Amino acid sequence: MEVNILAFIATALFVLIPTAFLIILYVKTESSSS
């Protein structure tokens, strides 16, 4: 089976961008509360 590189990159970005956004929000709330 041939791996579609563009599909893999699109999936990786689709997962990583919201995850990074949530981590940034979490860090901001943790630093502001403490």
Swiss-Prot record:
<keyword id="KW-0812">Transmembrane</keyword>
<keyword id="KW-0674">Reaction center</keyword>
<dbReference type="GO" id="GO:0009523">
    <property type="term" value="C:photosystem II"/>
</dbReference>
<keyword id="KW-0150">Chloroplast</keyword>
<dbReference type="InterPro" id="IPR007826">
    <property type="entry name" value="PSII_PsbM"/>
</dbReference>
<comment type="function">
    <text>One of the components of the core complex of photosystem II (PSII). PSII is a light-driven water:plastoquinone oxidoreductase that uses light energy to abstract electrons from H(2)O, generating O(2) and a proton gradient subsequently used for ATP formation. It consists of a core antenna complex that captures photons, and an electron transfer chain that converts photonic excitation into a charge separation. This subunit is found at the monomer-monomer interface.</text>
</comment>
<protein>
    <recommendedName>
        <fullName>Photosystem II reaction center protein M</fullName>
    </recommendedName>
</protein>
<dbReference type="GO" id="GO:0009535">
    <property type="term" value="C:chloroplast thylakoid membrane"/>
</dbReference>
<keyword id="KW-0602">Photosynthesis</keyword>
<keyword id="KW-0472">Membrane</keyword>
<keyword id="KW-1133">Transmembrane helix</keyword>
<keyword id="KW-0934">Plastid</keyword>
<feature type="transmembrane region" description="Helical">
    <location>
        <begin position="5"/>
        <end position="25"/>
    </location>
</feature>
<keyword id="KW-0793">Thylakoid</keyword>
<keyword id="KW-0604">Photosystem II</keyword>
<comment type="similarity">
    <text>Belongs to the PsbM family.</text>
</comment>
<dbReference type="GO" id="GO:0019684">
    <property type="term" value="P:photosynthesis, light reaction"/>
</dbReference>
<dbReference type="InterPro" id="IPR037269">
    <property type="entry name" value="PSII_PsbM_sf"/>
</dbReference>
<dbReference type="Pfam" id="PF05151">
    <property type="entry name" value="PsbM"/>
</dbReference>
<comment type="subunit">
    <text>PSII is composed of 1 copy each of membrane proteins PsbA, PsbB, PsbC, PsbD, PsbE, PsbF, PsbH, PsbI, PsbJ, PsbK, PsbL, PsbM, PsbT, PsbX, PsbY, PsbZ, Psb30/Ycf12, at least 3 peripheral proteins of the oxygen-evolving complex and a large number of cofactors. It forms dimeric complexes.</text>
</comment>
